[in-house]
Curated annotation (Swiss-Prot):
Coiled coil: none annotated. Its cofactor is Mg(2+); Mn(2+). This is Protein nucleotidyltransferase YdiU. HAMAP family: YdiU_SelO. It is an enzyme of class 2 (transferase). Nucleotidyltransferase involved in the post-translational modification of proteins. It can catalyze the addition of adenosine monophosphate (AMP) or uridine monophosphate (UMP) to a protein, resulting in modifications known as AMPylation and UMPylation. It catalyses: L-seryl-[protein] + ATP = 3-O-(5'-adenylyl)-L-seryl-[protein] + diphosphate; L-threonyl-[protein] + ATP = 3-O-(5'-adenylyl)-L-threonyl-[protein] + diphosphate; L-tyrosyl-[protein] + ATP = O-(5'-adenylyl)-L-tyrosyl-[protein] + diphosphate; L-histidyl-[protein] + UTP = N(tele)-(5'-uridylyl)-L-histidyl-[protein] + diphosphate. Keywords: ATP-binding, Magnesium, Manganese, Metal-binding, Nucleotide-binding, Nucleotidyltransferase, Transferase. One of its GO terms (molecular function) is ATP binding.
Length: 487
């Protein structure tokens, strides 16, 4: 019998090869007493990595202590607008792009190590990440992925004995983040504001060839590409609003050119339905409040369009940007109709949606729980599983009567509709208090709560009785937590 050949990831680092001057080469700086705490088995399988990659001595890769053949570590430079103000040069201040893995299906995946030490772009930072923020990003990116929302992924969490000084002393940690690209709106802004139009075009050509090859050579390739960026961003905002996700720090340097969620910091999911929910305690003006996210995304796209103004006419830019609102409204409308159990469109659908949301605001009802219970409605029953959640029974009964009447227009039976609604209304979301409980135990080297929460979040739409406690309403102290940007 022939010995089993060990699989080794293959790296083809086009960013390093084609974009000289867009980065600085450097090596990760290891942490003291680093050790692998946890990893995502489903993602590992997608990347072709079996269990032995997460045992000694292979774990040295996840801790920045060793490189795999073909890796070319570098820190990317970019700039951006932060809280609406031009912030100048930023860049990878604590992250290092290790390399671009070529998968068997032809896709490429960046391996990006967060918390890897000082870079030329660290500014006043120490280049490190703390265990708290690494666990939050791991859980959030995996949660959004399994909710069907485009996002970066997280493969490994490394903890250490390395002290990191924030508001208090915390454990240093590293996260191996995976995404098809880490290019941000801010990459284009950087070279635009440095008056380097050739570099803006070089970057645009690289991105198009890498991710939109069908438009290479087209006479309107830049407009077609930018239009798709606009529409992808619009659809991403629809996803966020539909599941009740607040990102918290939508600076242009945190906006992906591929329209994926990335750079998880002070994020939060809605508990009670509060449209103006602010999850970032540094956001004193509410710029990045939950209900303002679609408007901020469009503002950010205008900043990107400005940086691309040397590649397109003003009319082409405007035409692309005008695609945003229709794409947003179509995606949001489809997703919210699915949450309500409507397969067909009807003129009263919007009134029913706004009526339910208004009741939720008035009575402080939980966003996720309300829609999940709505999935259990039986169209021919006057009894609603939601009724006991509302104090103003008369107002709810009036809404529910109109809702049942609307459901009776649908062509599918209760069982089919309930299943389709459950597939649109998650039972399990990453509430901040659950993340905090997992963090508290992980800091004591107990990963059981982390493992359990991660497992539940991998099937957010499926009833899992063993995880019913993770679907419970949050305690009063756990509602609407505001999170610090410090990480």
């Amino acid at each position: 019998m022939k010995p089993r050949m060990e699989y080794a990831p293959e790296f083809d680092n086009s960013y390093a090869r084609q974009l000289s001057g867009f980065y600085t080469r450097l090596q990760p700086t290891p942490l003291k007493g680093a050790r692998l705490l946890y990893h995502s088995k489903p993602l590992a399988q997608e990347l072709g990595l079996d269990a032995h990659w997460f045992t000694e001595p292979k774990t040295a890769v996840w801790a920045g202590e060793a490189l795999l053949p073909g890796m070319e570590p570098l820190a990317q430079v970019y700039s951006g607008h932060q809280f609406g103000m031009w912030a100048g040069q930023l860049g990878d201040g604590r992250g290092i792009l290790l390399g671009e893995q070529r998968l068997n299906d032809g896709r490429y995946m960046d391996w990006h190590l967060k918390g890897a030490g000082l870079t030329p772009y660290s500014r006043m930072g120490d280049g490190r990440a703390v265990l708290r923020s690494v666990i939050r990003e791991f859980l959030a990116s995996e949660a959004l992925h399994h909710l069907g929302i485009p996002t970066s992924r997280a493969l490994t969490i490394v903890t250490s004995d390395h002290p990191i000084y924030r508001e208090q002393t915390e454990r240093g940690a590293m996260l191996l983040r995976v995404a098809e690209s880490h290019i941000r709106f801010g990459h284009f802004e950087h070279f635009y504001y440095r008056q380097q139009p050739k570099q803006v075009q070089q970057l645009a050509d690289y991105v198009i060839a890498r991710h939109w090859p069908q438009w290479v050579g087209h006479q309107e390739c830049y407009r077609l590409w930018f239009t798709d960026v606009v529409e992808r961003t619009a659809r991403l905002m629809a996803h966020w609003q539909t599941v009740g996700f607040a990102h918290g720090v939508m600076n242009t340097d945190n906006m992906s050119i591929l329209g994926i969620t990335m750079d998880y910091g002070p994020f939060g999911f809605l508990d009670d339905y509060v449209p103006g929910y602010i999850c970032n305690h540094s956001d004193h003006q509410g710029r990045y409040a939950y209900d303002n996210q679609p408007a901020v995304a469009l503002w950010n796209l205008h900043r990107l369009g400005h940086a691309l103004s040397g590649l397109m006419s003003a009319d082409q830019l405007q035409l692309a940007l005008e695609a945003y609102e229709p794409a947003l409204m179509v995606a949001y409308g489809e997703q919210m109709r699915a949450k309500l159990g409507f397969l067909e469109r009807d003129s009263q659908d919007n009134d029913l949606l706004t009526g339910l949301l208004s009741l939720m605001i008035k009575e402080g009802r939980d966003y996720t729980r309300t829609f999940r219970l709505l999935s259990e409605v039986e169209v021919h029953s006057a009894q609603s599983p939601l009724r006991d959640d509302f104090i103003d029974r008369a107002a709810f009964d009036d809404w529910y009567r109109r809702y049942r009447s609307r459901l009776q227009q649908e062509s599918i039976d209760d069982d089919q509709r309930q299943q389709s609604m459950k597939a649109a209304n998650p039972k399990y979301i990453l509430r901040n208090y659950l993340a905090q409980q997992a963090i508290t135990q992980a800091e004591k080297d107990d990963i059981q709560p982390l493992q359990r929460l991660h497992q539940a979040l991998q099937q957010p739409f499926t009833d899992q009785p063993e995880f019913d406690d993770l679907a419970a309403l949050p305690p009063d102290w756990g509602k609407h937590l505001e999170i610090s940007c410090s990480s």
